[in-house]
Amino acid sequence: MSNDAMSNDDVIDELNKLIETCKDGEYGFRACAEHVKSTQLRQVFTSRADECRQGATELQTLVTRLGGKADTGSSATGTMHRGWVNLKGMLTGDSDQAALNECERGEDAALERYRDAVKKSLPDDVALVVQRQYEGVKRNHDQIRKLRDQMRSTA
């Protein structure tokens, strides 16, 4: 982190970007859950969607506490990605593998977004929340990658 403190508005903007990321993840995992055949994957995706929703809610609370207006929706990129997940799920015969591939792509984007955020000079209380959520995104990413690799090796 640099020593240059961020303005309150910049902190709110950064948190709102992370809220969009969480919402993208929530909706993406739910879309993937709708297309998989495996009950285990459906449960994993639903659980990840719930974690993303909880993360967004936590960040929205911080934004409100800082006097800002919290984002409540996802990004345009996330909406396009969900459309691609839906289309790909309908077109491919191996929807479980396709869903895992798409979820990993989504988690790659979330990981990059959080990696950028933890490098910023956020207030200590905000930085703690962002760092904790970043660790969760890394765990999600690793779990999805592991499931994807396991599925590839059994195919």
Language-model regions: role of each:
Residues S2-E20, T64, M80-H81, D149-S153:
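N-terminal/domain-start segments enriched in small and hydrophobic, helix-friendly residues
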Residues S2-I12, E34-K37, T61-L66, K88-S95:
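Short, charged, low-complexity loops and linkers
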Residues A5, Q43, D50, A70-L87, ...:
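Charge-rich, acidic-biased intrinsically disordered regions
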Residues D10-L18, T39-T57, D96-L100, D125-V137:
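Alpha-helical scaffold segments that form or flank carboxylate-/histidine-based iron centers
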Residues E14-E34, H81-V130:
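Acidic/histidine-rich alpha-helical segments that form the ligand environment
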Residues E26, A49, A56, W84, ...:
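Short amphipathic alpha-helical/adjacent loop interface patches that line ligand
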Residues Q40-G78, I144-L147:
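Conserved alpha-helical segments that form or flank metal/cofactor-binding pockets of metalloenzymes
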Residues E112-A155:
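A generic hydrophobic-segment detector
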